[in-house]
């Protein structure tokens, strides 16, 4: 448990109280307590005096203490019994907060999406104070869009489901090995369904275990070589499991990894040699003999090719253009993480705790880059607080051996095109990240002018999540990617691949362009808690898909080389 868990609890209780129609002062008390914790620079393990914080009283403290001691909240459980379950999902609808939903519940008897839709269709909602005809129309539109089964899932959702499935597979008996296949193995940013290849000598036993997986809504197929199920999570998710022998595993894995175009190209090569590729192996057409391979590497070697990384198996052209001389970045080459947050802004853990987690990963360095003063919602740091934070970092650096914490900041590029700090403040930083968090709807030329201001400032080292997109949720702001890459090249400023699975920004095609131009890239997690540091794996996979070579990745370099880059404009 960390501080963010408690903040979420307090905010959730406030929302439920609002839905119930409780006294606004009680609602406010829980929101104030959440804000008090958010604004305190310490992590949960460092706080032994919560009652001394302005905003936390006896009532809210007793709720916090129960949650810490017992891992549950009787206050929240009681509220959940009193508030209709169907009201909570309505909070996801744009324009509907707790107060408005409480009004709909109290005055119209709205208790779920269906009853809200009915009230709107009967034009009852527009008659309530605080609503109108346009509000009613927007609610109906939002209800129509909510809960729709997307054709393809964002990779972040697919990864969550995959990890849950793999946790079960790793505990099954009679499985020799298993692997993801399909578009998830190729690291596509959206995924239609999940595919697994399982090597086993006991397919019947494995099949029975697969049919006992939790969350199965329906079974589509259940044979000795294939089990297909629909799993019910946030969305209904189709999963195919293919059961093969160990010797068939490499060619089956290759076949079902795809892509279609990659497989077509490989089949053409085989045909020219008088061979035929199938999921079972490589058949010599003349004799009917089928050859299998110990691994995909030997499969490709059979055709005189290097092992082509699954992430780049897309157009088929990679069969001709990829060679062993291309050194795509690997997770083990990452030496540090240069974008993360602590309790000084909106992170869940202290600088020490984040540093200790990075040391456990074997990193040589990290950068603490809390939000700047403009982002008040994230408890952004004033220039004075940056100075105070620097003292804490200095003390930790004096304590740690063979590890360096870089003093940094994630500075907002403001809507008017100026930067959130003056140059004299930035000059004191080891590393400066610049990013856009506001006014996404500005026209392209205005956005580009904002980015240019940052890129041409000699103190700015990195542009974070350069397009602002969220996969499947937000397209991001309008930018000229070619101009951005050229500016980054000219100013020798690094562009970030934000490894958060919801972002993966820069995207694949942008990474390809940046790599072609030799732009310095940096793979950062933007971690707001210790668990998010693990997103580096997803980021590296996304970087590989964009043909990112080790030589172009800033945080694959030694501390000495990183420091040289950061001082390039001195």
Swiss-Prot record:
Q: GO:BP terms for this protein?
A: DNA repair; DNA replication
One matching Pfam family: DNA_pol_B_thumb
Molecular function (GO) terms for this protein are:
DNA binding; DNA-directed DNA polymerase activity; metal ion binding; single-stranded DNA 3'-5' DNA exonuclease activity
UniProt keyword annotation of Transferase present: yes
> In which residues is Mn(2+) 3 bound?
410, 437, 465
Where do the segments described as DNA polymerase type-X lie?
1-315
Instruction: Explain what switches its activity on or off, per the activity regulation comment.
Output: The polymerization activity is inhibited in the presence of 2'-3'-dideoxynucleoside 5'-triphosphate (ddNTP).
Ligand binding (a divalent metal cation 1): 193, 195
Provide the binding site for a divalent metal cation 2.
Answer: 193, 195, 240
What note about domains is in the entry?
A: The 3'-5' exonuclease activity resides in the C-terminal PHP domain.
Name the record gives this protein: DNA polymerase/3'-5' exonuclease PolX
Q: Which organism is it from?
A: Bacillus subtilis (strain 168)
State the taxonomy lineage: Bacteria, Bacillati, Bacillota, Bacilli, Bacillales
């Amino acid at each position: 448990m960390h501080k963010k868990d408690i903040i979420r609890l307090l905010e959730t209780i406030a929302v439920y109280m609002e839905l119930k129609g409780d006294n606004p002062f009680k609602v406010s008390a829980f929101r104030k307590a959440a804000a008090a914790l958010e604004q305190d620079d310490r992590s949960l393990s460092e706080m032994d005096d919560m009652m001394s914080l302005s905003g936390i009283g006896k009532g809210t403290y007793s709720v916090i203490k129960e949650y810490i001691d017992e891992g549950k909240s009787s206050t929240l459980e009681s509220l959940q019994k009193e508030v209709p379950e169907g009201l909570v999902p309505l909070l996801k609808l744009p324009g509907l907060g707790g107060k408005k939903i409480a009004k709909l519940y109290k005055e119209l008897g709205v208790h779920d999406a269906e009853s809200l839709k009915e009230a709107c269709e009967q034009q009852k909602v527009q008659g309530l104070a605080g609503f109108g005809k346009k509000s009613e129309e927007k609610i109906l539109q939002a209800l129509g869009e909510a809960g729709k089964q997307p054709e393809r899932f964002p990779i972040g959702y697919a990864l969550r489901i995959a990890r849950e499935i793999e946790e079960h597979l790793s505990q099954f008996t009679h499985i020799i090995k298993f692997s993801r296949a399909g578009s998830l193995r190729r690291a596509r940013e959206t995924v239609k369904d999940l595919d697994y290849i399982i090597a086993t000598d006991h397919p019947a036993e494995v099949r029975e275990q697969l049919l006992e997986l939790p969350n199965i809504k329906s079974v589509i197929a259940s044979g000795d070589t294939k089990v297909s199920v629909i799993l019910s999570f946030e969305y209904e998710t189709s999963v195919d499991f293919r059961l093969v022998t160990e010797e068939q595993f490499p060619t089956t894995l290759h076949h079902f990894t795809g892509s279609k175009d990659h497989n077509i190209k490989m089949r053409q090569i085989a045909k020219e040699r008088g061979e035929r590729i199938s999921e079972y192996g490589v058949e010599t057409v003349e004799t009917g003999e089928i050859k299998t391979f110990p691994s995909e590497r030997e499969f490709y070697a059979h055709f005189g090719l290097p092992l082509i990384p699954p992430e780049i198996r897309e157009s088929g052209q990679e069969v001709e253009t990829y060679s062993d001389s291309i050194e795509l970045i690997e997770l083990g080459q990452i030496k540090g993480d240069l974008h993360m947050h602590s309790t000084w802004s909106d992170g869940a853990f202290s600088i020490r705790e984040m540093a200790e987690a990075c040391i456990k990963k074997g990193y040589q360095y990290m950068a603490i880059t809390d939000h700047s003063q403009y982002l008040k919602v994230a408890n952004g740091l004033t220039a004075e607080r940056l100075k105070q934070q620097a003292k804490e970092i200095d003390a930790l650096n004096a304590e740690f051996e063979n590890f360096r914490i870089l003093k940094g900041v994630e500075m907002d590029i403001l809507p008017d095109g100026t930067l959130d700090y003056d140059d004299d403040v930035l000059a004191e930083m080891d590393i400066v990240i610049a990013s856009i968090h506001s006014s996404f709807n500005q026209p392209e030329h205005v956005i580009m002018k904002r980015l240019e201001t940052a890129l041409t400032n000699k103190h700015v080292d990195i542009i974070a999540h350069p397009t602002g997109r969220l996969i499947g949720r937000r397209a991001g702001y309008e930018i000229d990617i070619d101009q951005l890459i050229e500016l980054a090249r000219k100013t020798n400023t690094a562009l970030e691949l934000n490894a958060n699975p919801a972002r993966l920004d820069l995207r694949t095609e942008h990474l390809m362009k940046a790599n072609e131009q030799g732009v310095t890239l940096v793979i950062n997690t933007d971690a707001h808690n210790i668990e998010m540091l693990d997103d580096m794996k997803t980021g590296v996979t996304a970087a590989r898909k964009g043909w990112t070579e080790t030589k172009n990745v800033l945080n694959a370099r030694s501390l000495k080389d990183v420091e040289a880059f950061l001082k390039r404009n001195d």
